A protein has these predicted regions:
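Hydrophobic, glycine- and aromatic-enriched re-entrant/interface helices and adjoining loop segments
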Residues: 38-40, 564-676, 709-712
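Membrane-interface segments at transmembrane-helix junctions in multi-pass inner-membrane proteins
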Residues: 407-409, 465-490, 508-517, 538-540, ...
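Hydrophobic alpha-helical segments of polytopic membrane proteins
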Residues: 520-534, 538-590
Length: 788
C-alpha cells in the first residue's frame, strides 16, 4: 500500500474528500419533501373545473391556467385560461400549441378589426389578401404584392444579412423567421395593422406546418378569430378535445394523461412543486397521490450502482496496490470505462425522464474526480485546482437543487455529474493511450484531425443558426466546441509560424506563407462571428476579443516582440480604464439610445434602480450578495445551511448559469469567494506553467517535429487559459456589476453542461497529457541530429 506522505496529490485528495463529504452531508441534512405523483380529476357529465398553479403543483403556471370540462358524452375538453402562457398538447400526430391553428385555403382570420382572406396554403407557403394587397409568407420571408419588404429601420447588420440570405437561397436553405402582426409599420417580416399592438399575432413554421397563433404583446391584446366552414373560433379562447392526447405541458410542467371510469389522471413528470408535508386543501373534484422525494434511490438504481461499484473497485485497485516501477494499465482502463459507461447511463436516464437519484449522481461525480487523481503522471497545479473547482461547483449546484422547492432544480447537478463522468472517462482513456504511443504525431495527421474538428464545429454552428437560438440547439451549445476547435487550429498556425527562420525566405515569400497559415483560423473566426451575430448573442464576441488579445500577447512573448507586447498591455489598461470611467461617470439617461435590446441592458447596468424591470437581475443579485456578507447568509461559511432552503436567492433569473457566483456569495460569503478566487487563479497559473514548459521544450529541441509539438502545446494551453480567464472575468464582472450582463457561465461553477463536456474536459485532458509527456521527455530529444 502507498505510504501516506504530505505530497500535492495527498493534499488534493484530502481536500476533495472534504468537499465530497460536504455533499453527502447536504443530502443527509436535506429535509423531507413531498410532491403529487398522481393528480385525479373527477367530474360529472357537464361539469368543469379551473386548475392552476396551486391545483397542479406547477410553479410556472398562472393562478388559473386551464379549464377542464366533461361533456354529456363523457369526453374531456381543455381550454387555456392564461392570457400570457401557452398550453402544449402532445399526441401521436405531434405537438400542438393551444391558441394556434394551421391555415387552409378559403379560410379567413381576423386580428382586431383587420380581416384577411386565405387564398392558398400548403406546407411551403401561405397566401392571403386584404384591402387589395396580396401577401405571401414562406416561413422565412414576407412578400407584399410579389416584393419582399424592406428591412426595418432599427434592424442590425446581422438581421439585414439574414434577410438577404433568405431571399437569395432556395427555401430548403432558408432560416425560419416568424411573421408578426401589429404596429403601424410594414417592414421585414412585420405586417403593420392600425390600432393593433405589435406582436398581437404571429405566423411561423412549427413541426413542418405554417401555424397562426395569438401573441403576447406588452400592450393590449387583440382578438384573434379564425373563420372556417361557417364557424368562427376565437383562438385565445380555443377549446380542444383531449381524445388521443398523450400529454400536456402547463407552465413548463409536463403531465401524462389517462382517462378511465369518468376520471382523468394527470402524472406530473418535471418542474413539480415540492411541499414540506403531505396535505393540501384541494377542490372536491381533485385528489392527489403523494410521494416523498427520493434522494438516495431512484430509477434503474441497481445497474447504475453496479457500474459505480465497478468504477470504485478499479480505482481502489489502481491507487492502493503496491507501487511498481511501471503502473498497471488494465485497472486504470477499467476505471475509465466504468466511469464513462456510468455517465452515459445517467445522462440517458435523465433524458428519458427517469433521472438517477442525487446520491447516485454524487457517487458518479466522486468516481470521476477520483479518476483524475488516480491516473498516472505527476499531479500538476492546474489538475489539482481543476479537481477542487469541479468539486466546489458540484457542491454549489447540489445546494441549489436541494434549496429549491421544485423537483427540477436537481437536474442541473445530475446533468453536470453525468457529463463530468463522460468527460473524465474519455479524457482518462486519452491520457492512458498517450504513453503507449511512440514518437511525435505527423503534421499531416494533426492537420487532418484539426480540419475534421473545425468542420464538425462549423456544422454544429450551422445547425444552431438553422434550428436553434442563442441558447443552443438540441440542448447543446455548439459554441463551446467551436472555441475548442478555434484554439487548437490557431495554436497549430502560430506554432508553424514560429518555426520560420528569418534568413530562409524573402519578405514577400514570408508574407505569403503567413497568409496561408493564418487564413484557416481567420476564416473560422469570421464564420464563428457571423453565426453568433445571427443568433443575437454578442457576449461570445466579447469573449473572442479577450481570447484574441491573450493569444496575440502569447505570440508576442514567444516571438520576443516587445513592442507588440507593450502595445497589447497598454490596450488592456485603456479598456479597463474606459469601463471604469463609463460605470463611474456616465449619465444613465444618456448613455445609450433607448429601444435596442443591448442599449436597454447597458442602461440597466449603469443604473439598475432606474430600470426595475430590466434591471431586476442585477438588483436581485446585488441583494443576494449583500445578504451573504463575509461569512454567508448563515454566518457560518454556508456550513449550517447545507441541504436547507436557498431563500430569495432562487428568485434571481438564470441563477444556475450566469448568476451562479451571486448564489455562491450568498451561501458562502466573501470568505468562500476568496477561496474560490484562489483556486481559479491557481488553475490559470497552472495552465500557463505547463504552457511555458512546453515552449521551453520546443525551443530546446533540435528536431523540428518536437519543436512544433512544444510550441503547439504552448499556444493551445495559452488559448485555453485565455478562454477560461475570459469566462471568469465576464462572469465575476456581471455578478459584481462591474460589467453589463454578458450571459456567459462561470467555468466550473455554473451548470454549463456543454462548456464542461466540450471545452473544460478536453482542455484538462490535454493539459495532463502534455505535462505527462514533458515529464517523460524533459528534453524533447534535444540531442537529435535532425535539423529543423
Amino acid at each position: 500500500m502507498i505510504a501516506l506522505r504530505p505530497t500535492p496529490r495527498a493534499a488534493t485528495a484530502c481536500a476533495l474528500a472534504l468537499l465530497l463529504l460536504l455533499q453527502a452531508w447536504s443530502l443527509w441534512r436535506a429535509p423531507d419533501a413531498w410532491f403529487p405523483a398522481r393528480i385525479t380529476v373527477s367530474l360529472d357529465a357537464g361539469g368543469s373545473v379551473a386548475l392552476g398553479r396551486h391545483e397542479l403543483a406547477a410553479a410556472q403556471a398562472d393562478h388559473n391556467h386551464i379549464a377542464l370540462r366533461r361533456d354529456g358524452a363523457g369526453a374531456w375538453w381543455l381550454r387555456n385560461l392564461s392570457a400570457a402562457k401557452q398550453v402544449v398538447l402532445h399526441s401521436a400526430a405531434g405537438e400542438r400549441r393551444m391558441g394556434s391553428a394551421s391555415l387552409a385555403a378559403r379560410q379567413a382570420f381576423q386580428i382586431g378589426a383587420a380581416r384577411f382572406e386565405v387564398e392558398d396554403a400548403d406546407a411551403a407557403s401561405v397566401g392571403f389578401a386584404r384591402d387589395g394587397h396580396h401577401w405571401r409568407y414562406d416561413g422565412a420571408v414576407l412578400y407584399r404584392d410579389g416584393q419582399a419588404q424592406a428591412p426595418c429601420a432599427d434592424a442590425r447588420l446581422g438581421a439585414r444579412a439574414l434577410a438577404l440570405w433568405n431571399r437569395a437561397l432556395p427555401a430548403i436553405l432558408t432560416i425560419g423567421r416568424p411573421l408578426t402582426f401589429g404596429g403601424n409599420v410594414h417592414c421585414a417580416n412585420r405586417l403593420g395593422l392600425a390600432d393593433v399592438t405589435p406582436g398581437a399575432a404571429w405566423l411561423a413554421r412549427i413541426d413542418g406546418r405554417l401555424q397562426l397563433a395569438a401573441g403576447n404583446p406588452d400592450g393590449e391584446r387583440a382578438a384573434l378569430t379564425l373563420s372556417a366552414h361557417g364557424l368562427d373560433t376565437d383562438l385565445r379562447r380555443q377549446e380542444l378535445p383531449l381524445d388521443g392526447v398523450q400529454a400536456i405541458v402547463v407552465g413548463h410542467t409536463r403531465f401524462q394523461l389517462g382517462a378511465a371510469d369518468g376520471q382523468l389522471q394527470l402524472l406530473p413528470s418535471r418542474r413539480v412543486t415540492l411541499f414540506s408535508a403531505p396535505g393540501l386543501q384541494l377542490p372536491p373534484s381533485l385528489t392527489w397521490q403523494w410521494q416523498r422525494r427520493a434522494l438516495w434511490s431512484g430509477a434503474a438504481a441497481t445497474p447504475l450502482w453496479c457500474a459505480l461499484a465497478l468504477a470504485l473497485a478499479a480505482l481502489l485497485a489502481a491507487t492502493l496496490r503496491p507501487q511498481p516501477p511501471a503502473r498497471s494499465w488494465r485497472a486504470d482502463a477499467l476505471a475509465c470505462a466504468a466511469v464513462l459507461l456510468g455517465g452515459v447511463a445517467a445522462l440517458a436516464l435523465q433524458r428519458a425522464g427517469h433521472a438517477p437519484a442525487a446520491a447516485q449522481s454524487m457517487a458518479l461525480a466522486g468516481a470521476a474526480l477520483w479518476l483524475w487523481l488516480a491516473l498516472p503522471g505527476r499531479l500538476t497545479l492546474a489538475g489539482a485546482a481543476a479537481v477542487l473547482l469541479l468539486a466546489a461547483g458540484l457542491l454549489a449546484q447540489l445546494e441549489l437543487g436541494l434549496g429549491g422547492m421544485e423537483t427540477s432544480w436537481l437536474r442541473y447537478y445530475q446533468k453536470s455529474a453525468a457529463l463530468l463522468a463522460i468527460g473524465a472517462g474519455l479524457g482518462g482513456a486519452w491520457r492512458l493511450c498517450g504513453p503507449r504511443r511512440t514518437g511525435v504525431p505527423s503534421q499531416r495527421g494533426v492537420e487532418a484531425v484539426l480540419a475534421a474538428l473545425a468542420a464538425l464545429a462549423l456544422l454544429a454552428l450551422a445547425m444552431q443558426v438553422l434550428w436553434g437560438d442563442e441558447t443552443g440547439v438540441f440542448d447543446l451549445q455548439p459554441v463551446e466546441l467551436a472555441k475548442l476547435a478555434l484554439t487548437a487550429l490557431s495554436a497549430h498556425c502560430l506554432a508553424l509560424r514560429l518555426g520560420w527562420h528569418g534568413d530562409d525566405h524573402h519578405r514577400d515569400s514570408r508574407a505569403a506563407r503567413w497568409l496561408r497559415l493564418i487564413a484557416p483560423a481567420l476564416l473560422f473566426l469570421a464564420l464563428l462571428g457571423v453565426a453568433l451575430v445571427q443568433v443575437d448573442d454578442y457576449s461570445p464576441l466579447i469573449l473572442l476579443l479577450v481570447w484574441g488579445t491573450a493569444m496575440a500577447f502569447a505570440y508576442a512573448l514567444a516571438a520576443r516582440n516587445r513592442a507588440l507586447a507593450a502595445a497589447l498591455a497598454l490596450l488592456v489598461l485603456l479598456a479597463a480604464g474606459a469601463i471604469a470611467g463609463m460605470h463611474g461617470g456616465a449619465d444613465p439617461g444618456e448613455a445609450a439610445p433607448a429601444g435596442d435590446f443591448y442599449a436597454d441592458r447597458f442602461q440597466a447596468w449603469l443604473a439598475p434602480a432606474l430600470h426595475p424591470h430590466t434591471g431586476q437581475q442585477l438588483l436581485l443579485g446585488a441583494r443576494a450578495i449583500g445578504d451573504g456578507g463575509w461569512w454567508g447568509a448563515d454566518a457560518k461559511l454556508g456550513l449550517a445551511g447545507l441541504g436547507q432552503g436557498a431563500g430569495a436567492a432562487l428568485l434571481i433569473p438564470a441563477v444556475q448559469d450566469d448568476f451562479a457566483p451571486a448564489f455562491f456569495l450568498n451561501r458562502h460569503g466573501l470568505v468562500g469567494a476568496l477561496l474560490l478566487w484562489a483556486l481559479q487563479a491557481a488553475f490559470i497559473v497552472g495552465l500557463l506553467r505547463t504552457a511555458l514548459r512546453g515552449h521551453a521544450a520546443g525551443a530546446a529541441a533540435r528536431d523540428h517535429r518536437h519543436a512544433w509539438l512544444g510550441r503547439f502545446r504552448y499556444f493551445t494551453l495559452c488559448g485555453g487559459a485565455a478562454f477560461v480567464l475570459g469566462h471568469l472575468l465576464l462572469s465575476w464582472g456581471t455578478n459584481l456589476a462591474i460589467l453589463p450582463i454578458m450571459g456567459q457561465p462561470m467555468s466550473f461553477l455554473s451548470a454549463g453542461g456543454s462548456h464542461l463536456l466540450f471545452f473544460l474536459c478536453p482542455l484538462l485532458a490535454f493539459s495532463a497529457a502534455s505535462a505527462l509527456s514533458l515529464e517523460e521527455n524533459p528534453s524533447c530529444r534535444s540531442t537529435s541530429s535532425t535539423k529543423s
